[in-house]
């Protein structure tokens, strides 16, 4: 823009122009210092626009009417301060009762299964046609049902995510690598058929139950209700119940494990590949209560992760994946010195046990090798006899059995198990054997420990079908036959799934306030439920994050740097903790800074602790209103009323006939006394009735506006809405539903803007943090819907005005077209106070840029329409930088410990590709051919094999991997209403004015565009990956957060029969060696 001084200068002669140019050059970047944007003019524009837009928002939302109606009832309401400790104790009690019901259902299954097995006599010739979950309803080319594939009636059931199920019968899944008619499986399926009536009875007693099942130690999986299983594209169902966490956790006790891997020269080629896969399968069987390390040996010892020399680490998913990456780097050479490795393994287990950090329960050494030249009895005598508390599990790799006897003896002499793994296809089944050995003490003790898993995603649904987080309660099933008691035979594990949303139903969201929430963690500090848990990421379609089930509380409540809250909850304490928090909203782009009070206690009967967070201020208060049922029912009948679908006003799960009811329908039936079996929250319903009565007049108000066509002639305002603290909503459309610009708004798919189990709507939460009487304006960030950003949402909070306490009782708002909103802005910016009508400055001038930004720095209006929704710092970096320096805005650093970052990885066709059963089979076939050629022609093909099987393709593949990031958010300083500034750039001075829009969260920014100031970089909100150097990575690996061990431990039992150790057939030749532990015992007394 050209100012009056400049125009004056322009009229002078050539000499004056030259003098001015020389002066500008002398001043450097302090130029155009007289060219200021008039603050008074910008103030006028801001005032005009603010008044106009508030008038529209207040008028169409009906905010003043609603505030007036609540004010009229103010004398009839009681305001109470929420007692957080009493609240969390009551919620924990509710959850205990729910968990107890689920545990009892599982206990009934255990009793029925053990009784059925006790009565059954094994019949090797038993022929029994059972319902095979893969084959049911399948026909051959002649139209006849396949064997094991009889007709099995299936019908969609909304209680089971609308999957087709049979609620009268269970069916059986058998892993692809097992024979459907194996006598052991047929007998097991036959006697477990008696579980059907218990499944049905459990479901009748507790209709909120979902999947119930029995996972057999033989490998089959009986599931109720029956459902058809579909193979993958290769015709394979890789699911093996024995490899699931609920099975392993229930079957065994926590354990410390050292895995020894032979990497001597004889292990080259396929043997090393099988060894790696064996290690990987062992890692799959380890859970969060276990600890491990991997040591390779030849002439020397090599820790797979050198940083963890001489210690063990928790077997969480992150650590296991870290070790898997190192497995790919193993290579074979030299000779194997097993004695050194065994000495090291025993010392590591002993030293780690003394730290008190491990499982303090079972201990084991897993030995993976192609042979042993000695029995190393002196080492076992030194470290392990006579107690034999460290079990030895030996895995002989390859078909040769020359050194098998020594390995068998080691396992049998140390209460372990020996297996031989000849091909990749053998790995899974052989690895599983050790779990049944570790289960023996528990079986002999006959201790039916109840176990609960961490949260995981329902495997019956694809990730893009919806998020169903759940936990499983499971119990082991034992053989009760007296003759097998000392053998400790585990029959399997029974369990049932508990959706996390069931836990959330026990939580009265209306008592937690607008920003309040409940959360629960496991004994390891991992999140069971928390509104900030984000298990999925999007890349084309929704996918599970690799480590979603082991997100620690400290990774979402990261402001608690000393883990005070986390550690208190892990240790099952009851108490209170307070801290300032930075809660992100609106897809993480905005931040609310507040102080939270946390209340916590333990949940008895489960390894979980419960917490409640209440935000200070209005979040700590609750009020009770009172109206008659007749009044309330009348106003609930209005068609514009809806209730939060995910809130539990009435329990519609207790009786099947109630499942089809919406919460609003259930309340109406309950109040009318038509459904005496309905159980409802009387206190919440009373407040719903109150809100319905108080907000009822707004329906007529909106209707009158809609009928007056001249009021909204250009149809700029499209929707008016309100929500109350009880989850009650009212909506009014000023245009036809098909004409709405944003078709998703206030619909179930727009999770951010509706009441759900985790949070209040975004427009409600943001309005609550605004100054009472002002509106918060925002545009939705793009989420793939083309026209979604073409609207502006305005909302304001309604408060019960009281001298001391002012709880937010409701929020109202409107949604209008962005074009309508922007037109109002440009109209206001053309006004000026000049009497002659000639404005000194205008947003139409080429020398200025005008913006409308919100309190988080996002652009709502710009002359360049494509900048709408962008962060102001990316467009005007120099101005934003100056605003930060001046204190008009402040930068807040945030952290995301659940992020996914792009990483370049060398793709490999070696070990990981062999997880596929068919690839495993082909690899095994290739190995056999290689061995045959070696035998016939004595020609060394190892180098050919090795290069073909384990060489990595020389190409980089970009993948998304879990990472930690930090990123900024920006918040305006409320006390600063207006600011002017000049920025010294390289060859010019850039002036700007920022002016707050009255009664809003908006700011008008007018910037001198003639000075580009390109030397100042844009300010971006892009997250930056936090990269840890090697020493810090090592420290993070070693660091172990406080955890609580499971209360039960069954590490060993004196009556255990250790003779079944996988090597009984050849023990006779080694009787003398087997007597060594006994001799050692005698001499040690």
From Swiss-Prot:
The protein's matches in InterPro entries, at most eight in alphabetical order, are given as: Ca_channel_alpha-2/delta, VDCC_a2/dsu, VWA_N, VWF_A, vWFA_dom_sf
Instruction: Spell out which residues lie on the membrane's Cytoplasmic side.
Output: 1084-1085
Modified how: N-glycosylated. May be proteolytically processed into subunits alpha-2-3 and delta-3 that are disulfide-linked. It is however unclear whether such cleavage really takes place in vivo and has a functional role.
Which Pfam families has this protein been placed in? VGCC_alpha2, VWA_3, VWA_N
User: Can you list the GO cellular component terms from the UniProt entry?
Assistant: GABA-ergic synapse; presynaptic active zone membrane; voltage-gated calcium channel complex
Q: Which cysteines are joined by disulfide bonds?
A: 412-1049
State where it is primarily located: membrane
Keywords for this protein: Calcium, Calcium channel, Calcium transport, Disulfide bond, Glycoprotein, Ion channel, Ion transport, Membrane, Metal-binding, Phosphoprotein, Signal, Transmembrane, Transmembrane helix, Transport, Voltage-gated channel
Q: Where does the record place the Cache domain?
A: 452-543
Where in this protein would one find the motif MIDAS-like motif, according to its record? 262-266
Give tissue specificity per the record: In heart, it is expressed in atrium but not in ventricle.
Q: Outline the extent of the VWFA domain.
A: 256-438
Binding site residues for a divalent metal cation: 262, 264, 266
Its domain description in UniProt is: The MIDAS-like motif in the VWFA domain binds divalent metal cations and is required to promote trafficking of the alpha-1 (CACNA1) subunit to the plasma membrane by an integrin-like switch.
Function noted in UniProt: The alpha-2/delta subunit of voltage-dependent calcium channels regulates calcium current density and activation/inactivation kinetics of the calcium channel. Acts as a regulatory subunit for P/Q-type calcium channel (CACNA1A), N-type (CACNA1B), L-type (CACNA1C OR CACNA1D) but not T-type (CACNA1G).
- What does the similarity note say? Belongs to the calcium channel subunit alpha-2/delta family.
The protein in question is named Voltage-dependent calcium channel subunit alpha-2/delta-3
> Which species expresses this protein natively?
Rattus norvegicus (Rat)
Q: What gene makes this protein?
A: Cacna2d3
